Amino acid sequence: MNEYHNSLKSKESVKDERQQKLQPPSMYQVILNNDDYTPMEFVVDVLRKFFSYDIERATQLMLDVHYQGKAVCGVYTAEVAETKAAQVNMYAKEYGHPLLCTLEKV
C-alpha cells in the first residue's frame, strides 16, 4: 500500500478510537430496599439527607419502599452511585438500622 492510503487508514483508526472513547458513561440506579425494622422516619431522613428530596417526595419514595419492597432514589454514574449507596449503608449501620441501598445498572 502507498503512504497516502496508510495515512487515511491511520486517520480512520483514530476516528474509531475517539468514537469509542466518547461513549456516555454507564449509569446505575441507586435502590433503597425495604426491611421490617428500619423506621419510616429514618428512611425519609436518608432520602432528604443523601438525595436532597423535599419532604413530600421523600415521603412518597419511603412509601414506595414500604409497599413495593424497593424504590429508585436516583440514577447516577458508577462512582456517584457507589458513593451514595456506601454513604447510606454506613449511615444506617451507624444508627443500628438494617436499611440496605443497592445498585442496578441501567
Swiss-Prot record:
InterPro entries: ClpS, ClpS_core, Ribosomal_bL12_C/ClpS-like. Residues 9-20 have a biased composition (Basic and acidic residues). It holds the Pfam family ClpS. One of its GO terms (biological process) is proteolysis. Belongs to the ClpS family. Involved in the modulation of the specificity of the ClpAP-mediated ATP-dependent protein degradation. Binds to the N-terminal domain of the chaperone ClpA. NCBIfam families: PRK00033.1-3 (NF000670), PRK00033.1-5 (NF000672). PANTHER family: ATP-DEPENDENT CLP PROTEASE ADAPTER PROTEIN CLPS (PTHR33473:SF19), ATP-DEPENDENT CLP PROTEASE ADAPTER PROTEIN CLPS1, CHLOROPLASTIC (PTHR33473). This is ATP-dependent Clp protease adapter protein ClpS. It comes from Photorhabdus laumondii subsp. laumondii (strain DSM 15139 / CIP 105565 / TT01) (Photorhabdus luminescens subsp. laumondii). The lineage of its organism: Bacteria, Pseudomonadati, Pseudomonadota, Gammaproteobacteria, Enterobacterales.
